[in-house]
């Protein structure tokens, strides 16, 4: 936020306001100690005080060590093929499943949106598909085989976030940045990049 507002500000390493947000800023040591920003809420508030907005990258996949993986797995809402990071057992969720979209948003809302987050960078919405095998496309989704519906993955994932945020509040504009798109996806406030 500071660099965007004034490109030379970032060079003011002695500035006490800037230094307090760097790890070990007081002694400029190379090792990292306790971060200056202690909580995500403090970081979001700091960016807002700089008259800027903040967005966060959110992936459509979960590792087996996470609570979300367990919840999605109990719904049979994980697609059974490898995604990023490779060879870690991480699986994309099934955005075609409305209950899975509800769960995905409930965690985003509780852990991120309620803190004041302004936008979403929805990454891996193709989704990333590692160790690709033809039979992976026979994986069942809520709407049938992945082969039949895989191109609509970004549409459904973006739809879920957009509709849930709009249902949560009309006081904050939805902004989604995504690297994957599908026809008509712009209606969900999706902006594609590549």
Identify the function of each model-found stretch.
Residues 1-194:
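Catalytic-domain carbohydrate-binding cleft regions of carbohydrate-active enzymes
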